[in-house]
Amino acid sequence: MRLPFELYIALRYLLARRRQAFISLISVISTVGVAVGVMALLIALALMTGLQQELRDRIVGSAGHIYVWKLGESGLAEYEVELERLRQVPRVTRAAPVILGQALATTDTSEAFITLKGIDPNLEADVTEIGSAIRDGTLDALAPSGAGTLEGLVIGEGLAAKLGAFVGDEVTLLTPQGRLSPMGVMPRARQFRIVGLFDMGLHEFDTSYAYVRLDVAARLLDRTGADFIELKVDDLYAAPDVAESITRELGTSYLTQDWSDLNRSLFSALWLEKMAISITIGLIVLVAALNIVASLVLLVMDKSRDIA
């Protein structure tokens, strides 16, 4: 069977004789070098992209897409009205009020400084992924308890490990918002019962955050209404545009921030690392490609007499 002319010519010059074996070896090594370099580049880019997406999903899952504050002394004292206004903004799908403060959590064996987050359990579960992150217990247990029973507290698994506590154990929270006494300002203290443990996949979050009901946090931290409102939008990447539209529609008395603003330094560092890896591996591919060019030049020079 006769081979096609093009295939015959290709095989003739690819299958080198003994004196051409060195050139063919260089070609093979260079080709393999390019293949390995490209493979390493694709794997590195895939890993960095996957890391960025996973980190983004975990960060956004632990909080809302947009935060809204109201400037002034009254702030969000009547947050129910603000919730309804914000729900009317295009592309906003969910809204939840939040109170945030610092406290000292103590048990019989340990203590830790925590960030206390007051929430409406039903609304918060719609805005963030806290509901699906519960590993033991339930977020619904934060509902108002009966007379004489302790209020519920949901904490991260990392924080539970630091305190040596489990679901059902009692924890005392102390806040600096206390009352004046002859001894000075006495911290406000209140006992809680752990009703749930969560794991958001973020070490800092899981080791320092605790959730209580909004009205409980207001009394404990001496707040009125809510500190800010978390919003969820229909498209994660539309959050910056929606935040700008909220400021335009509601006026300059409102301050907004989206998830990308709050984590800009982190994602910028990841982007720079991704670019550095791409450039480094790209140079490796370039060196291998130059070897291929060199081997082809040698091959052409060797075969120049055979070219009519």
What are these regions (language model features)?
Residues 52-83:
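Membrane-interface junction motifs in transport/secretion proteins
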Residues 1-38:
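N-terminal Sec/SRP start-transfer signal
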Residues 3, 7, 11, 259-263, ...:
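Alpha-helical membrane-protein architecture signal
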Residues 14, 59, 85-90, 246:
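Hydrophobic C-terminal alpha-helix "anchor/cap" residues
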Residues 80, 84-224:
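A structural signal for hydrophobic secondary-structure junctions
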Residues 23-49, 271-308:
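Hydrophobic alpha-helical transmembrane segments of multi-pass inner-membrane transport and secretion
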Residues 177-178, 185-277:
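Mechanotransmission and gating elements of multispan inner-membrane complexes involved in transport
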Residues 13-14, 54, 58, 220, ...:
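Amphipathic alpha-helical segments that mediate coupling or scaffolding at interfaces
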